[in-house]
């Protein structure tokens, strides 16, 4: 009885320590080390979610020129105040909308920034939502890995996830990846139950079809995850018995899930694929260029093949980083050669591998960048499961070492070393925070207060703004913004389209147009608008002496020249090393 009480006390003590650690790291990354949302995709989804919370449906204040082109080509009515959102998958947006509605974010005035505010309050709400999904995913993966292996391996993986700086950076970005991780983990858990049932000669139908339900939700979180489902579908075709029955059921479930968005896109824009298809032009600058064109972008097969090859090589060379930095996750590939005693463990690893291969193919086609906040990154969904297999392999090797027979910490030395290596970046991060804690005023060229406090005051709610960071203008300033095109010709076409409903009120330019780029890259990305992009910077550092000359540029002068420009009135929004400015069609008046 005493031994049992001691075990219960020890178990309670360990759980209490784990809970305290979890809460502490949660607070660290959502309060003390949080400086605002760091991904434009996360910011974009948040602004769409606010429109949903307001009862405006799936509409966006961030207008892509290619979306206007789709509406024109299909003879759809264009209302710049009600542009349908056809780029993002809807589920994460709907989740954000529910959260924003609960905190009263549908009313912009409820959460306006003050002069001394460093962080937009709603940014933190979005980050907390993402972090909550991350904690949920940790719990699901604990249940899954403890069922595949044991509680010790599951606990190790859970701690590795908690200590992963990469995972926490994703939560701070506002990306849908944490919701995706939760749904994928739930789908994988049910897929494992189906494999278990079949290996035990029971019927796998119910858990297999339930896994299809979660894969459907996953597809509604990010269209790229359809590639993962293709891998699972192929596995189901050849493994589950009776062959083909479960696979057909899975396909039917997926079709039901994606039918709604496809019908929505078709009815709203005349194209079932929406604007999301144009992401196939490649990650980063290529896809951005396609989105900023009024005319349909040319589809280059040779370019697609070249980008796919380049992206595949990038994935191979950066697989550890893409797997969330979870130590031992890449060891999963060594597990493919290990003869596991339980057939279910051996079979399930092939399911993971097939899904991962097809996910990699999809990422190769649509492209990845080396950025840690790449929105098309799907590798991290597999990281906990792969890490579980990796820890299991290390544990098997360790069991053959004499030290493993020792009791206490010495017998678990391999686990301690793994956790120490994983926690090192987190400990370093905490040390840096304690030495120099300073909230950033700008994240990748987005100065929240200049938009929320200043641009909002010099514009009206019905104004249409052309901007180089329209996602940020939509979220922080609560204004409709069109992504600035690369050519002056496209700009005039957009003006002509806008004249029919809501004329363009002004142009917002920030350091986003050149920040982090060398001048050649910046010139390529901005083309005719390059002079306009650099004008605030040159104006600030030359005290306007050279600005007068550059404004004579044939692409810039008709827009902002004080005498002949269509947007001659200027308001400076931010200065120092990242200046931004707003050029208005009418005389600027600051509202209270």
PLM region descriptions:
Residues 11-22, 159, 205-213, 229-234, ...:
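Signature aromatic-anchored transmembrane alpha helix within multi-pass, membrane-resident enzymes
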Residues 16, 21-22, 156, 161, ...:
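Transmembrane alpha-helix segments characteristic
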Residues 33, 409-468, 472, 505-511:
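Membrane-embedded, lumen/periplasm-facing catalytic core of multi-pass transferases
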Residues 141, 234-237, 311-350, 356, ...:
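Hydrophobic, aromatic-rich transmembrane alpha-helices
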Residues 147, 198-205, 239-250, 333-357, ...:
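Membrane-interface helix-loop-helix junctions at transmembrane boundaries of multi-pass membrane enzymes
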Residues 171, 176-180, 185, 218, ...:
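Hydrophobic/aromatic-rich transmembrane helices and adjacent perimembrane loops
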